[in-house]
From Swiss-Prot:
One of its GO terms (molecular function) is cytoskeletal motor activity. Residues 1-38 are annotated as: Disordered. This is Flagellar hook-basal body complex protein FliE. Transmembrane segments: none annotated. It comes from Helicobacter pylori (strain G27). One of its GO terms (biological process) is bacterial-type flagellum-dependent cell motility. The gene is fliE.
Amino acid sequence: MQAIHNDKSLLSPFSELNTDNRTKREESGNAFKEQKGGEFSKLLKQSINELNNTQEQSDKALADMATGQIKDLHQAAIAIGKAETSMKLMLEVRNKAISAYKELLRTQI
């Protein structure tokens, strides 16, 4: 009969590979989470800044119309319409996000 060896040196290369792979997966998973979270927040901030700029242009166009300083009423109307449409879109996106969040809260585990 052959003697059973309790020699762990035979398994050590495999255990090192397993540990290395686990560490790499954890690092890549953390990097993925940070990357995705960062992208969404950047996208959200960028969208809000664009909406703010559009609203400011609309306000300036309205002020120029009120004071008679504007030369092209058509461009002012376009700026105002663009701001109105952008605000409606942002509100709908917000409403959908809130609705999805509420749906998640109702989900039973």
